[in-house]
């Protein structure tokens, strides 16, 4: 027990040159046993792993949200969960591949788009499989609930013939989102049931956008 208060040389680990076991345990419990779980030790690239660790452990990198920011996150979580609960109640047994348990994806995507707009990004291309796609369409791409519910009722209407008749959780959409006066065009690419098939398509689309926007700083 006396060893708990002996100084240990850390050489910068947990941002300290030295510390006691008691202090180390307190720090680790406060950082890794709180409301957020982190998983990054599986990353094979040591530079990426250290970057992630520094983002988690350094005080100056700690996430700090304003009250308005917290309200916006809560509002998006409520929208995401409410959407899933409604579909579960209204369309019992219908395939929808819900986002249940992963609703934090919605405010996370919103934040990425918002920060992107602040960084002068004009377009965002998204590729994803069908899990949570309907929620992203409704609450990030702002596809109307009416259109989504019509698709549940079997009324598939699409502007193009290429995707006409496809199931609702394969469809994509696009919209212009505005945050703090910055407009960002966001598009979600259609994807079949082959989960990762969309990945090279989105990479190619993003590369084409870079070419036509003369974006050479990539």
Question: Residue spans of the language-model regions?
Answer:
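Conserved internal helical-beta-strand scaffold that buttresses enzyme catalytic cores
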Residues: 1-218
